[in-house]
């Protein structure tokens, strides 16, 4: 029988637009997502497939927030050490693999910024911010904006899974 192969060379055009297209397509499908019913956002193409390290980090974050299957289609022999570190971020992968299996919902969109909220097992939540604008941006994350009631007995702790920073 024949053996099928695929080409892992870098494409001539940037590929992050396809990541954003898949992300946008999958957002309204979250209501169908649960263990046993996974929305397939497509392959992880980061690392050597015509994407920057920042775009690779964004794709892994988005796919993890969507509880998507994490299937890498990049050429493993050509991944930089930085790309391997990004794609192997255990904390971000744990968000994807959380046993609750729920997909994030879009809680805020504006000025090129999306804020996603994903319920996790144990009553925790993951929050991700996507800058799909053309330059640097910032967003103020207030509990009410993220869907949390402003109560005195509510205590919030935040961890940056990419930078390691912690804030209470």
Residue ranges and their predicted role:
Residues 144-164:
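Solvent-exposed beta-hairpin/edge-strand motifs
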């Amino acid at each position: 029988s024949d053996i099928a192969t695929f080409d892992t060379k870098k494409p001539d055009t940037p590929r992050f637009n396809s990541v954003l297209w898949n992300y946008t397509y999958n957002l309204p499908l979250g209501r169908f997502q649960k263990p046993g019913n996974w929305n397939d956002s497509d392959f992880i193409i980061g690392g050597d497939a015509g994407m920057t390290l920042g775009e690779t980090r964004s794709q892994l974050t988005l796919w993890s927030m969507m509880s998507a299957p994490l299937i890498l289609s990049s050429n493993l022999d050509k991944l930089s050490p930085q790309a391997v570190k990004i794609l192997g971020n255990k904390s971000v992968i744990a968000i994807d693999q959380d046993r609750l299996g729920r997909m994030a919902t879009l809680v805020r969109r504006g000025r090129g910024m999306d804020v996603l909220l994903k319920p996790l097992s144990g009553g925790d939540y993951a929050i991700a911010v996507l800058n799909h604008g053309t330059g640097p941006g910032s967003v103020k994350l207030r509990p009410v904006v993220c869907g949390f009631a402003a109560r005195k007995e509510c205590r919030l702790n935040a961890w940056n899974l990419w930078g390691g920073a912690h804030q209470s």
